[in-house]
């Protein structure tokens, strides 16, 4: 309600109050306003204490699930999954971490090192030629995004299944 009241408006209200109320009665009015604020705060605190003593146990029963819900809502998805499925042990999810996977020595790295040392591929490796790799010399090459039918791109964006193989 008063969140958009700035210091300029407060100063204007103070000046209007000084003019309307007068400098003689303004200090007494400020003391009365201060006493009213203090009385309201003590009344609110007393009401809170009465509610806590009368309904404290019932409120505690409601507060526990609400605190658990607030804790779950503040968790990240990874933390929620590890807590629900793995009882908080996140070591299982480390096997899916790409940084840790790439940091480990993989079979591909070992193969590249062996090829670099010997200059040849291992004997058990065989080269497989796919039918898509064969080029028919009588056929004109297709470029992605173009069709041989007047240069218009096909509806699928110019790529075929052979581009993916």
Curated annotation (Swiss-Prot):
InterPro entries with a match to the protein in the record: TatA/B/E (IPR003369), TatB (IPR018448)
Keywords, in A-Z order: Cell membrane, Membrane, Protein transport, Translocation, Transmembrane, Transmembrane helix, Transport
Polar residues compositional bias, start-end: 111-121, 137-146
GO molecular function, one term: protein transmembrane transporter activity
Region feature (Disordered): 103-165
Localization annotation: Cell membrane
One of the record's GO cellular component terms: TAT protein transport complex
Listed GO biological process terms: protein transport by the Tat complex
Main location: membrane
Biased composition range(s): Basic and acidic residues: 123-136
Membrane topology listed for this record: Single-pass membrane protein
Annotated transmembrane regions: 2-22
Stated role: Part of the twin-arginine translocation (Tat) system that transports large folded proteins containing a characteristic twin-arginine motif in their signal peptide across membranes. Together with TatC, TatB is part of a receptor directly interacting with Tat signal peptides. TatB may form an oligomeric binding site that transiently accommodates folded Tat precursor proteins before their translocation.
NCBIfam families: PRK00182.1, tatB
Quaternary data: The Tat system comprises two distinct complexes: a TatABC complex, containing multiple copies of TatA, TatB and TatC subunits, and a separate TatA complex, containing only TatA subunits. Substrates initially bind to the TatABC complex, which probably triggers association of the separate TatA complex to form the active translocon.
Similarity-based family: Belongs to the TatB family.
Protein name: Sec-independent protein translocase protein TatB
